[in-house]
């Protein structure tokens, strides 16, 4: 199986991705696969969180395979007062269907478990799709609906990982 790595995004990397993405491959030795950042609004949010002092392990990650950035995702922030974290992810269209999202999400679930998080949550569009399959494979269960400012109604998913 192909090794998938999740690499925390640094402030410097986020700034380059946001303002000078054409410089990223030469600076970091990683090719950006077109479409790796399906939700570009996540990048400024991640950059601001890092500048505000959110620890990198609770922010965004590059999903890499060999020397390519194939996706982007991670946590939306540190655990809340109830011990929950939320994850999100996207994979470049040309690299989908290869298990990369499942491998990345599994890595974040394991990281959350190691830090004593009680539950990992995620949201998907309200229809069966590859992302719902990723979450089901990892043991997430659908836990109702929520309203997303950009997407409207979404399905809420939860995986209990601690006590």
Name the predicted role of every residue range.
Residues 1-86, 91-94, 110-111, 115, ...:
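GNAT-family acyltransferases
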Residues 89-91, 97-111, 133-137:
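Conserved acetyl-CoA-binding loop-helix of GNAT-fold acetyltransferases
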Residues 122-132:
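Conserved beta-strand-loop-alpha-helix junction that forms the acyl-donor binding cleft
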Residues 138-142:
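A SAM-dependent methyltransferase catalytic signature shared across enzymes that methylate proteins
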């Amino acid at each position: 199986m192909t090794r998938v790595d999740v690499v925390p995004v640094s402030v410097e990397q986020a700034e380059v991705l946001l303002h000078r993405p054409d410089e990223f491959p030469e600076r970091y030795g990683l090719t950006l696969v077109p479409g790796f950042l399906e939700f570009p609004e996540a990048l400024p949010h991640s950059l601001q969180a890092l500048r505000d002092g959110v620890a990198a392990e609770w922010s965004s990650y590059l999903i890499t395979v060999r020397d390519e950035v194939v996706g982007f995702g991670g946590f939306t922030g540190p655990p809340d007062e109830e011990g929950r974290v939320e994850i999100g992810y996207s994979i470049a269209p040309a690299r989908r269907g290869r298990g990369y999202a499942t491998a990345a999400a599994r890595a974040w679930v394991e990281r959350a478990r190691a830090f004593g998080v009680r539950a990992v949550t995620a949201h998907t569009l309200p229809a069966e799709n590859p992302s719902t399959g990723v979450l089901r494979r990892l043991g997430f269960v659908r836990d109702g609906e929520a309203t997303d400012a950009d997407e409207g109604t979404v399905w809420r998913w939860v995986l209990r990982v601690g006590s």
